[in-house]
Amino acid sequence: GVSWIMGEWDMDASIGYGKNKMAFTIENTLNRSIGPSSKTEFEAGGFSYDQLVYNLTGVRSVDMASMASPVNVAVGAEARREGYKLFAGEPDSYRFGGVMLPNGLPAPPGAQVFPGFRPANESNTHRTAIGAFVDVEANLTKELLASIAVRGEHYSDFGDSLAGKLALRYDFSK
C-alpha cells in the first residue's frame, strides 16, 4: 500500500490479492462399481477461491469546541473481485463401472470414502462488490466515547447492502 498526506487528511491506498486451493486425494479406498481392477487412490477434484481488493481510505481529526476531544473522521471506498471455482475429479473417482451386487442392484458408484466431484458440479464464478463507508468518533465527555458508522455496498450478484454501527464506551477509570 501507499500512504500520504493530502491537506488535513491522512490517506492510504492499497491493492491486495489472495488465493487458496484445496484438492481432494482419496487414498486406501476403491470404487466398488469398477470391480477388482479398481485403483485405491483417486484425485477427487476440489475448489479454489481468489480475491482482488483495491481500497482508498482517508482519516482526519476535526477540533470542535463542544466535544471533549477532536472528532475523528474516516471515509473510504473499496472495490473487490472474488472468484470461486469447483473442479471435477478424475472419472474413476465418481463414475459407475458397471459391477452389479449379488442381490442384482448396481454397486454404488465412485470412491467409497468420497465420490469425487463430477463435471456437472463444476463451476467458475466471479462477483464484484463496490463499497464506501463513513466513520465518526469522538469523546462526548472525558469518560464517554461515541462512535457512529455507515457502510454501503453494491454486489454484482445480489444487489445492495447498507449496514450501520452505533457505539458508546464509558471509561470508569478516568
Segments from the language model and where they lie:
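Outer-membrane beta-barrel transmembrane domain signature of Gram-negative proteins
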Residues: 1, 5, 17, 29-145, ...
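Outer-membrane beta-barrel proteins
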Residues: 11, 21-26, 82-88, 98-99, ...
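One face of beta-strands
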Residues: 15, 164-166
